[in-house]
Amino acid sequence: MIKNQKSITFINGVLEDVKAEKEIKIDDAYNNTSIGAILSSTLFYWNYIAFTDCRNLTKGFIDNFPIPLSAVEDKIIVNDGNALFADYEANKRTKDTYYQSTGRNVVYDEYYPKLSKQYIDSIDITLAKHYCFTKEELDFIINYDIKYRMGDE
C-alpha cells in the first residue's frame, strides 16, 4: 500500500481487515507518491490489461513493472500524484450495504478514477518523456479503452 493507507471496511459495525488486500513495501529511496501516481497511470492500466488475467493484480506483476528512476524522482509526477490522490478523496463515496445472503452490513469507500482523468493524463504525459514514447504512442495510451473507462456504468 502507498503511504500506509489502509482500506477501512466495517462489517456489522466492526472494523475488519480486507483479506485480499496486500501491502506494497517501497524502498525509502523512492517517493511513495510518485510510485502511487505511476501505478495509477493509464500506462500501468494498459499493461495490467495486456499482461494479466484482468482480475488479480499481483505483487509479482507490480514488482516487475519497469519504472525508470528518473520518473520516480520527477517532481511533476509527485505534484500530479498529490493532486490525483486529493481528487480521489474529494470524489469518493462511502457506501453502507447490507448483504442479505450473509446477514452482514458492510461500510466501504468507492473511488471513481474516471472523475480524475485530467490528473491521470498529466501523469501519462510526463511518463511518456521518461519512456521515450512517440506522440502516437502517448495518444494510444491516453485514449486506451476510453469508451469503457469513461462511459456511464
Locate predicted features.
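S-adenosyl-L-methionine
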Residues: M1-E153
